[in-house]
């Protein structure tokens, strides 16, 4: 039996229900105690329930939310949202299909043109339920987590870079965008034919701008003779940091010009980002490279992750 929750007081057993849910995005980080996962999940659910723009559906053993995304809506030019599926051990295909069907029906009725989601690549039941309701494969990312000590590469192999690595300034904005336009041609936003021209560029532009303004995090650049050779942006993950003093910093965009990739520029940038993040209280650092971005994966292999998890990204367009 499905039930839409519109008031937090209507979910009487919310705390006990949350304890059986497997889908906390950070549950695979063992250093976070169980109460951190619990508090994070409850805050996330509370936000979905209390906003009139969102949907919160609960079944016997699972929860599904649809959260309006201002960021995606502004970039896409149409109403967009993020679907989250929270499963317990007792998940079933039939129940999952019904849950996603009801959620997408609500999204269509409320004029959501675009929905996206991420799901553990091992969750076959959830993936099939999404595909049965017109979600299409978009990408696979590998979430790698390491600590400060593991993130600093003491021995860097390659052609030693002589570039200057520094914090980016607002004057670098145009140069960074020029690099990103040359490099990011394989992102899921570029590859999805349903997106209009320029959508991926607007997404990347917004990420870079917020990093330069330090609204979300920070950005480092590699410079030589007044020309930029690469950049690296990172953001504080405020969702989980609100519940733990062990702060998590998430890598976002990084790129090095093709003719300079044999050098150590990317690893020099990584070192700078990790050291700076650590000075700001960061303990855990998370990378989310695409599973087929082999160049980044090869570089990250020099920094063995503490934890690794594969996630599938799926997109759904209305009437597709």
Where are the regions that the model predicts?
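A short gly/proline-enriched turn/hairpin at secondary-structure junctions
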Residues: 188-196
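Phosphate-binding active sites in nucleotide-utilizing proteins
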Residues: 216, 221, 233
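Acyl-donor-binding surface of acyltransferase catalytic domains
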Residues: 89-163, 167-171, 287, 293-297, ...
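Conserved donor-binding loop and adjoining core beta-sheet/short helix segment
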Residues: 43-108, 112-122, 229-258, 307
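Active-site rim helix/loop that mediates acceptor-substrate recognition in acyltransferases
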Residues: 21-56, 197-218
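Glycine-rich acyl-CoA binding loop
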Residues: 92-100, 222, 262-273, 277
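A short beta-loop-alpha structural element at the N-terminal edge
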Residues: 1-25, 164-187
């Amino acid at each position: 039996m499905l039930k839409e929750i519109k008031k937090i007081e209507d979910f009487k057993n919310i705390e006990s229900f949350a304890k059986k849910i497997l889908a906390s995005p950070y549950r695979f980080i063992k250093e976070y105690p169980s109460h951190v996962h619990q508090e994070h999940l409850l805050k996330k659910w509370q936000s979905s329930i209390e906003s009139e723009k969102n949907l919160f559906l609960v079944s016997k053993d699972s929860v599904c939310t649809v959260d309006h995304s201002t960021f995606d809506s502004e970039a896409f030019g149409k109403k967009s949202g993020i679907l989250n599926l929270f499963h317990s051990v007792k998940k079933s295909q039939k129940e999952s299909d019904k849950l996603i069907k009801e959620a997408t029906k609500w999204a269509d009725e409320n004029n959501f043109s675009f929905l996206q989601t991420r799901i553990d690549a091992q969750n076959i039941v959830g993936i099939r339920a999404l595909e049965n309701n017109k979600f299409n494969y978009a990408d696979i990312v590998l979430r790698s987590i390491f600590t400060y000590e593991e993130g600093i590469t003491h021995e860097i192999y390659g052609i030693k870079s002589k570039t200057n690595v520094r914090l980016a300034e607002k004057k670098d904005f145009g140069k960074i965008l020029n690099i990103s336009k040359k490099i990011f041609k394989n992102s899921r936003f570029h590859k999805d034919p349903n997106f209009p021209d320029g959508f991926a560029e607007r997404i990347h532009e917004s990420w870079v701008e917020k990093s330069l303004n330090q609204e979300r995090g920070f950005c480092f650049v590699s410079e030589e003779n007044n020309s930029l050779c690469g950049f690296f942006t990172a953001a504080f993950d405020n969702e989980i940091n609100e519940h733990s003093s062990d702060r998590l910093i998430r890598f976002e965009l990084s790129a090095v010009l093709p003719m300079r990739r044999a050098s150590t520029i990317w690893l020099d940038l990584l070192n700078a980002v990790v050291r700076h993040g650590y000075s700001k209280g960061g303990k855990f650092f998370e990378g989310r490279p695409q599973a087929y971005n082999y160049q980044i994966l090869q570089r990250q292999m020099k920094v063995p992750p503490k934890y690794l998890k594969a996630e599938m990204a799926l997109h759904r367009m209305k009437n597709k």
